[in-house]
Amino acid sequence: MSFSKYLSTAPVIGTLTAFFLAGLLIEINRFNPDLLVYPF
């Protein structure tokens, strides 16, 4: 199985998406520490 075909499988895409969202939340919390505490 080729490497590019492996990168297009669902677990790899899901893992990359999870890492991207986690990093995004960390960066948002670094600049706006109380953003997730506000009651909506």
Swiss-Prot record:
Chain segments annotated as transmembrane: 6-26
Biological role stated in the UniProt entry: May help in the organization of the PsaE and PsaF subunits.
Keywords: Cyanelle, Membrane, Photosynthesis, Photosystem I, Plastid, Thylakoid, Transmembrane, Transmembrane helix
UniProt subcellular location: Plastid, Cyanelle thylakoid membrane
Membrane topology type: Single-pass membrane protein
Record-given protein name: Photosystem I reaction center subunit IX
Keyword check for Plastid: yes
